[in-house]
């Protein structure tokens, strides 16, 4: 096999955001686009000679082709081992877990999260570091600098390899280990939660629906909920991953998951319902007749996490992004543990998790997670909710009412404005920012602004 050094010209705008480089799929499909960004990433981290990488994605359109490109480049750049999910599939939290369990040096995750998939939709690629979390700004800034001057990349002149069979194959001097994408993650969940109690919950007649939204969590949810815990067949809806997410929008909110919401709000709806997004890191929680906001969900989980075996000693602390409501702050105060507010972006929780300062983290954008991995984790949140329900033997609605009686209620609303003009949006944000210093103390209707930042 011949290592090729190909010349290339930098592409403008390859600046990673809070979750990697997100672009339209056709942008990524340009000749050399993936190669320039991946080589820039390898260069920015000091090369990958002798290293182990985890590679996988959410199965969206162009994932398969991009993974083959990355594997050839990893081999040409001297990597010793690539761990790849069977079929190229790995949920983002499962990839984080695999990096940590196998002691990998990092990973490349191919996903645009909750954004739609397809040739004319969205694509993404991000680098995670050895703790399993998203690359911090120092690394993403270094990657961006490399993209400005990249002039060549290394690859192999080889055909694609078969990622459909579990096992190890050689690609040049690099070993490619194709792993079951669900197995290690499911084992971790069984360590954290009382699976016997969950089996009893389902055996009692407790009803549930989980909408995988034709995305990557389908196989994970089917294996854990139906095959392991005994939930009835059909509990998992839209459970087969598709390159265009069934021509849907894999964002677990009341708009894009409306069929699930309508079902749980109906007279004969299930006791509990949940959904996850494209790459499996977000979640939506519902009970019969009620929707749980992500901010309230984080607070509820913080107050009740000790009921699950993995958290029976209590939580060290809790962290939330700045736009997330202060509901979890009230719980932290009552538990006498630390509470942190961070900028938006899961990577800002990493130092707190690594230092053992916090156990749970959450965002109002439907991301919740804990120190078990370094990414938010949709199915983990669902299983923790189930564990709490199994122990407390209350409905979701009754649990929320009890929580609000105990800690008070933070009224909170998120509004999404999609496909708006960028210039107009920037003007709006600039105007709001300019007014921040003067907003505190102002009254709007019946409400007075306490603080603004």
Regions inferred by a protein language model and the residue ranges of each:
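Conserved phosphate/anionic-ligand binding catalytic regions in large, soluble enzymes, centered on
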Residues: 11-27, 113, 212-216, 220, ...
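Short acidic, glycine/serine/threonine-rich loops at helix termini
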Residues: 26, 64-69, 94-99, 118-128, ...
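Proline/glycine-rich low-complexity loops and linkers
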Residues: 87, 137-182, 287-364, 368-369
